[in-house]
Amino acid sequence: MSRRKMFLKMVTASLLRRRSRMLIALLSIAIGATILSGLVTIYYDVPRQMGAQFRGYGANMILVPSGEEKMTVEKAQECLTVIPKDQLLGATPYRYVNVEMTSRQRTFVAAATDFEQVQSTSPYFAVEGRWPEGDREVLVGKETAETIGVKLNNVIELSYKPEDTYVKNTLNMTVVGILETGGDEEAYIFTTLKAMDALTGVSGQLDVMEMSVSAASEELENYAAEISENNSDMSARLVKRVTKSETTVLAKLQSLVFLVTAVVLLLTMICVSTTMMAVVSERRKEIGLRKALGASDQSIRAEFLGEGMFLGLLGGILGTALGFAFAQVVSVNVFGSSITFQPLLLPITVIVSMGIAALSCLLPIRRAVEIDPALVLKGE
Amino acid sequence: MILRAEKIAKWYYRKSGESNRFFAVSETDVQLESGSLTVLMGRSGSGKTTFLHMLGGLLIPDAGKVWVDDKDLYAMNDAELSRYRNRHIGIVSQGHTAVQSLSVLENVMLPQMMYADTDRINESADEWLARFGMEHLQEAFPSELSGGELRRMSIARALAGKPEILLADEPTGDLDDENTKLVMNALREAADEGTAVLVVTHESDALDYADQRWQMNAGVLTK
């Protein structure tokens, strides 16, 4: 038998002989590792998950012309290429024009847009009736609808007089939906871009492009800066209200994750340390004998450290698997989507678990090294 | 090899302070030489075990030095002293001490396995176990042995490494007459082969095997 084999046998046999104690230590390491790997998984996945949740509160970036000139649809599309397609959840163009409602002799703001995109960038827009499907259908904001007494399926006449003519362009539009947002949008009338082009006689112009991008605050800032740098006539800005609250919530959540992980790992250390102290007390005679036979303090340290790290290894592997299951349950129940396993998490959890186990063994090892063989062999 | 104790002493303080210094072993000069078997007799509590531990590098004397040839045992650091003890000094302790997680054979091999691994270790351990009638217990664990068997196992453990100095504390304490003879003959044989053997005992039978006889009373050694 080789020395290494005997060392391994002593470590494993010692662990097996004290199964119940070691099971407690192993369980506490596994629980610590579970919380560690589970929370770290959530920690790294939360920005993505929370980003998706926050996208429900509206666009987080807007694109506007930096000068007096209007923005063209082509220019806006060009700017969007900076943002990776998988991160761009929606981009809604808006063109605002003051139009006259002939029958009421009043002027309102008409917002021309792409209704399909609106639903992805502003999912909180609530429509009574339905979304417009054709160019002769409009949404009327709730406030406007109440002011002018318009109801679903009413036909309204919108007119616009271009500056360079004396003739008004007029379109008859059917109200297919009443829009409720709780914001300024309730004062607008929403049409398609095509209808607005027909009404104004000018096509391809935009005032603003609202974007919903699934990215962290810093990344968003980088995209905005890149767009503004590449296009001197365009300016990309973050919707601070949304991005700031997203960053604040994430920072608080991540601090909480760190705190909980730290507390659980501390408790794990206390539990493992107490168990190993009891093991040292039980093996006092044996340690004394081994010292008398020529074992150095270093070899006693190595043996207990070996036992602790072996427990850390097992607990780390077990904890990684349980942690992933834990993170999956949390993700599915809280965010409604599953997460993918990060392979790097296994070595990280195992190394941290082994480190925690090694740290927990420091005090018991000190006790073991301090055992006086002369006292033990005398039976004291 | 010569083991020499030079004015070694060990004392303890009682609670009332330095005036009540209690000597476990009073200042003593002794010498153990290769090829001799020395028997140290004395009553329980007379300081025999303390004296043996000081000679074996297990207990630092409060005064004096222990020399092995020209090496001051207690001038070495822990790693050096541990290795030296493992290589040159065999110790049979008083109680029933064994590593519970190892088999009888592995326990006997343990001291030699600490710093080396060769097949000869196995042979030597086999031989000593056979000699003490324990060949059938090689794979057994210490918890399955009787007191006498544990005692013989620890003597086999000390002898298997062929130490140059062998310090045995009550090596025949749990043994019947037959096994006492077996063990004392083995110790005698080790001395005849060049080992310096010290047997600490309170059994007068051991005196028949001795080259030197010492007596200890209340920490004072007389030759």
Write out the residue ranges for each language-model feature.
Chain B
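Conserved ABC transporter NBD signature motif
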Residues: G64-D72
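Catalytic Walker B motif of ABC-type/P-loop ATPase nucleotide-binding domains
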Residues: L166-D169
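Helix-to-loop junction immediately C-terminal to a conserved catalytic motif
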Residues: G56
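ABC-type ATPase nucleotide-binding domains, specifically the catalytic core motifs of the NBD
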Residues: Y13-S16, M109-N122, R131
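Short coil-to-helix segment of the ABC ATPase nucleotide-binding domain corresponding to the Q-loop/switch region
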Residues: L102-L110
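A short, proline-enriched helix->beta-strand linker immediately N-terminal to the Walker B motif
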Residues: A160-E164
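Conserved ABC ATPase signature
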Residues: F141-L145, E149
